[in-house]
């Protein structure tokens, strides 16, 4: 396994779901340095536009820098073109940025998702700029195998955002139980045509109480 892969696939679980009425994205909060838990409140999900979010796996410093740059670029796009950017446009911009640094890559794997004039979508982007549109579910990071097991068992194309939020929380929670590099709470957002909503820790706890053993 390369140094880049080790940096990316240790210390994070993120998931994204494309639902019939929106997009749901979730992460856990643990940041690690080898076997050391460096933070129990790491931010791994960012609002980068009105109805758009980005999740990050990998280097915290690289992720924070990219989140700032992409948010600025999204604002500039809207000012220059006098219309809101699409998810595809921001994913392409991010892909081009990462590819331009492919010989000295940012140690991140990203999910960018939301709702725009073209509909709802999520893109996964690798450290050297490869971008793939995910049609239904996606998981990244060290706990992704466990998360995929939960998502694939319960996801349907007709799932709504509220049910998908519970599924995303369940998937992250399952990964946290099996992956020592994931843990310490869950952040989850739902994005619909009407709102960008981030659930509070208390609301997440209420969801967890439904299936926690």
Curated annotation (Swiss-Prot):
It is found in: Cytoplasm. Keywords: Autocatalytic cleavage, Cytoplasm, Hydrolase, Protease, Proteasome, Threonine protease, Zymogen. GO terms for biological process: proteasomal protein catabolic process. The formation of the proteasomal ATPase PAN-20S proteasome complex, via the docking of the C-termini of PAN into the intersubunit pockets in the alpha-rings, triggers opening of the gate for substrate entry. Interconversion between the open-gate and close-gate conformations leads to a dynamic regulation of the 20S proteasome proteolysis activity. The active site is at 12 (nucleophile). It catalyses: Cleavage of peptide bonds with very broad specificity. Its main location: cytoplasm. Residues 1-11 form a propeptide. Its EC number is 3.4.25.1. PROSITE patterns: PROTEASOME_BETA_1, PROTEASOME_BETA_2. One of its GO terms (molecular function) is threonine-type endopeptidase activity. InterPro entries: Ntn_hydrolases_N (IPR029055), Pept_T1A_Psome_bsu_arc (IPR019983), Pept_T1A_subB (IPR000243), Proteasome_bsu_CS (IPR016050), Proteasome_sua/b (IPR001353), Proteasome_suB-type (IPR023333). GO terms for cellular component: cytoplasm; proteasome core complex, beta-subunit complex. HAMAP family: Proteasome_B_A. Component of the proteasome core, a large protease complex with broad specificity involved in protein degradation. The 20S proteasome core is composed of 14 alpha and 14 beta subunits that assemble into four stacked heptameric rings, resulting in a barrel-shaped structure. The two inner rings, each composed of seven catalytic beta subunits, are sandwiched by two outer rings, each composed of seven alpha subunits. The catalytic chamber with the active sites is on the inside of the barrel. Has probably a gated structure, the ends of the cylinder being occluded by the N-termini of the alpha-subunits. Is likely capped at one or both ends by the proteasome regulatory ATPase, PAN. Belongs to the peptidase T1B family. This is Proteasome subunit beta. It comes from Archaeoglobus fulgidus (strain ATCC 49558 / DSM 4304 / JCM 9628 / NBRC 100126 / VC-16).
């Amino acid at each position: 396994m390369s140094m880049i892969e080790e940096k990316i696939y240790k210390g994070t679980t993120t998931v994204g779901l494309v639902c019939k009425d929106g997009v749901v994205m979730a992460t856990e909060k643990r940041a690690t340095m080898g076997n050391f838990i460096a933070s129990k409140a790491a931010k791994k999900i960012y609002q980068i536009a009105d109805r758009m979010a980005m999740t990050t796996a990998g280097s915290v410093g690289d992720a924070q820098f990219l989140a700032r740059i992409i948010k600025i670029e999204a604002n500039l796009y809207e000012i220059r073109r006098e219309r809101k950017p699409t998810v595809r446009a921001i994913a392409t911009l991010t892909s081009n940025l990462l590819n331009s640094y492919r010989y000295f890559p940012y140690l991140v794997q990203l999910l960018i998702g939301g709702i725009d004039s073209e509909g709802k979508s999520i893109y996964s982007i690798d450290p050297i700029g490869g971008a793939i549109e995910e049609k239904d579910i996606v998981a990244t990071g060290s706990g992704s195998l466990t998360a995929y097991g939960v998502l694939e068992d319960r996801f349907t194309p007709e799932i709504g955002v509220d049910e998908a939020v519970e599924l995303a929380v369940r998937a992250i929670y399952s990964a946290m139980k099996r992956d020592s590099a994931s843990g310490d709470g869950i952040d989850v957002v739902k994005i619909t045509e009407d709102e960008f909503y981030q659930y509070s820790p208390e609301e997440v706890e209420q969801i967890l109480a439904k299936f926690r053993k």
